[in-house]
Amino acid sequence: MSSDFEGYEQDFAVLTAEITSKIARVPRLPPDEKKQMVANVEKQLEEAKELLEQMDLEVREIPPQSRGMYSNRMRSYKQEMGKLETDFKRSRIAYSDEVRNELLGDDGNSSENQRAHLLDNTERLERSSRRLEAGYQIAVETEQIGQEMLENLSHDREKIQRARERLRETDANLGKSSRILTGMLRRIIQNRILLVILGIIVVITILMAITFSVRRH
């Protein structure tokens, strides 16, 4: 499990390093190369998102007691991903302004105003994205807590079942002991009755012997 996560981590590190390098190169490229580079970065950003999803799935499969470290790493990677997307958006805005100026011949003031407006919208989107990410993280943590509670309940249920089994075994043993004691008492009573009968027979025999002896004399 952790080996798969670490493999995705390495792929993510290599990919984000490439994306960072390409984003930094975009402003310095000729228009044709910029267009190709922007398309390439978009594709790699999607690949990075897929890697994050795979890593997130791997973290959910890790036992709760070992999950904390991986969850912290995931938060760091998501923040890094958010920064890359922000840098790329700014790079695209600059690229779009440049293309628009070339096609429409807009003056510098209009371009600056539009760029400022786009940057403002971008910042709003980033804030919304951070709120969504925070909500998602809360949902994930809530799910983890729920899973831990379910596991604890499952352990408690197993303990209760084992206790019930022990009680059943104890009841069964008590039942056997009770039957054995009852049998022993019955045999003791029978033996005492036999002794009493034998004693009576002996007394009667002695009395009869004495009676016969007296009559002969």
UniProtKB/Swiss-Prot annotation:
Cytoplasmic topological domain residue ranges: 1-192
Ranges in a coiled coil? 31-92, 112-178
Give the protein's function: V-SNARE that mediates vesicle transport pathways through interactions with t-SNAREs on the target membrane. These interactions are proposed to mediate aspects of the specificity of vesicle trafficking and to promote fusion of the lipid bilayers. Involved in vesicular transport from the late endosomes to the trans-Golgi network. Along with VAMP7, involved in an non-conventional RAB1-dependent traffic route to the cell surface used by KCNIP1 and KCND2. May be involved in increased cytokine secretion associated with cellular senescence.
Origin: domain of life: Eukaryota
Keywords tagged on the record? Coiled coil, Cytoplasmic vesicle, Golgi apparatus, Membrane, Protein transport, Transmembrane, Transmembrane helix, Transport
Could you give one GO CC term from the UniProt record?
Answer: trans-Golgi network membrane
What's the family?
A: Belongs to the VTI1 family.
Q: Name one GO biological process term.
A: vesicle fusion with Golgi apparatus
In the bilayer, the protein is annotated as: Single-pass type IV membrane protein
Where it sits in the cell: the answer is: Cytoplasmic vesicle; Golgi apparatus membrane
Q: What is this protein called?
A: Vesicle transport through interaction with t-SNAREs homolog 1A
Q: Which InterPro entries does its entry note? A: GOSR2/Membrin/Bos1, SNARE, T_SNARE_dom, v-SNARE_N_sf, Vesicle_trsprt_v-SNARE_N
Identify the residue ranges that face the Extracellular compartment according to the record: 214-217
Q: Which gene encodes it?
A: VTI1A
The root-end lineage is: Eukaryota, Metazoa, Chordata, Craniata, Vertebrata
The record's section on Gene3D superfamilies has: 1.20.5.110, t-snare proteins
Where does this protein chiefly localize?
cytoplasm
* Claim: Cytoplasm is one of the keywords in the record: no
| Membrane-traversing stretches | 193-213
Subunit: Interacts with distinct SNARE complexes that contain either STX5 or STX6. Interacts with NAPA and, to a lesser extent, with NAPG. Identified in a complex containing STX6, STX12, VAMP4 and VTI1A.
Q: Which PANTHER family match?
A: VESICLE TRANSPORT THROUGH INTERACTION WITH T-SNARES HOMOLOG 1A (PTHR21230:SF26), VESICLE TRANSPORT V-SNARE PROTEIN VTI1-RELATED (PTHR21230)
Q: Which GO terms describe its molecular function?
A: SNAP receptor activity; SNARE binding
